[in-house]
C-alpha cells in the first residue's frame, strides 16, 4: 500500500497520526509530542497545517472525547524561536547588546 | 452539576498523575484528576526530565535514590516506555570552593548507596571526548543518574491510572475550593462542583493560588527557566553534563537532540514563559565553551517553563494543621520531575494511612514558620 508522508523532517506517515488518534492522543499539542509531527528542522512549517486540516475533517468519534475537547482547541501550536535553525557558533558570536 | 469523588487531584503534571496512579494502586476507588489544559502543559512538559541523586543533604539524597529505584522499573510497571536512560550525571568542577563542597559530600552519598565518584581530567576526557577541559579541575560522576522523556512518563502514568479507574478531566480548570461545614471540600470548575473528603493540590507553580482559596499561604515563587534543543545528532554523549556554578546543563536525548539550558540569576519572579534571545546567547556561549564541536550544531527550538521555588529550594510536602483531608506537593524548585516517583509513593501513603515509609515531616509547610531553613548546595540555576 502506498505510504503518505505527513511530516517530512521526521518521516512520519499519516497512518501514525491515525494510530495516535485511535489511542486517544487527540489534540494537536499532544499529537506533536506523541508522533513527533512538527518537531523537526522545519518546526512544523510544512506539516502542522496539513495535520490541522486532517483533524478538522475527521469525525470526533475517532478520538477519546476527553482528549478532543471542543473545536476551539484546534489551533496552531506556539511558534518557538529561532525561526530557522541556527548554529550555536553563529549565536555565540552575536553581539550582546544588539537591540 | 454536582459530582462526588473520594479524592480530587488538582493538576495533571507528573506529580498529580503519579500520585493519582499510586492512590489507585493502593485501592482508592473514585479518583478524579482535574487538569486545566492538556496533560503536560505545565512545567513537566517543558522540563529537561533529568534524574540525579547527587545532592548535598541526606534527605534529598535518599529521596532521589528511592526515585531512581522506581524509575528503573517504571516502564515495566506502567506498560509504557519512559525512555529512562542511565547515562549518569557529570558535574564539572571549576574551582577549589566547588571542589570542597562536592568532594565533601561524596562520602555521604556513597554511604547512602549512591555510587558517585570523583574523576580527574583524564577520566573526564575518556568519558566525554570533546569536552573543553580548560579550567575544569575535576568532576563528580554518578553512573546511575539519567533522564527520561517527560511526556512518556506523563502518558504512562495517565494510561495506567485510567486502567485502574481514575478519571482524568483535561481542559478543566479549578476555579475555587471551599471547605464545607461537614469537613469535606467542594472543588469547583466552570461547570461542575466536586464534593470530596480529600483534595490533593499538585498544581505546580499554581499550587499556592489553589491553597489560597482555603486561606493557606505557601511561600513559593515562580521563575521562568529557558531551555533549547538542537537538531538530532548521531549519539555521542552519554551523561548529562552540568555545572553547579555556571548553572547550565545539557544532555543528548534518545532522539539525538542536545537538550539543555542555563539559569539566569537576574530573572525576576513571574509567570511568564516566553522565550528570550538573551537566553539563547548565554546558552550558546556556555555550550560552545564547554563542548566546542557543538558550535556546528544547529538549535531548532527554544522554550521556557516555570520553576516553583521555595525559600530553601526543597519541596513542600504533606498536609496542613487544621485542614484534614487537604494535601499538597509543590515548591520543587526545578527538581520535581526527578522526585515525582517517590513523592507520589509517600504522598499516597500519607493520604491513605496517615504516615509515610520515609519521613517527610522536615518538608512540611510549617518549617517556614520557624527559624532559618537549610538550602542544599547542589541547586542548579
Ligand atoms: C526548563 C525546565 C527544566 C527542568 N528540568 C528539570 C530536570 O531536569 N529535572 C527535574 O527533576 N525537574 C526539572 N524541572 C522542574 C520540573 O519540571 C518540575 O518540578 C515538575 O515538572 C513539577 O511537576 P508538577 O506535576 O508538580 O507540576 P506541573 O507539571 O506544573 O503540573 C501542574 C499542573 O497543574 C495544572 N493546573 C494549574 N492550575 C490549575 C487549576 N486551577 N486547575 C486545574 N489544573 C491546574 C497545570 O496546568 C499543570 O499541568 C525543570 C523545569 C523547567 C521549567
PLM regions and their residue ranges:
Chain B
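Beta1/beta-strand and adjacent pyrophosphate-binding region of the FAD-binding site
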Residues: 2-15, 32
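Glycine-rich FAD pyrophosphate-binding loop
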Residues: 24-44
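Dinucleotide-binding Rossmann-like beta1-alpha1 core, especially the glycine-rich loop
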Residues: 48-127, 247-248, 278, 286-288
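Helix-loop-beta segment of a Rossmann-like dinucleotide-binding subdomain
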Residues: 82-93, 105, 112, 118, ...
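Helical element adjacent to the flavin cofactor pocket in flavoenzyme catalytic cores
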Residues: 142-197
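Central helical "cap/lid" subdomain
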Residues: 192-238
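C-terminal catalytic lobe of FAD-dependent flavoproteins
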Residues: 288-381
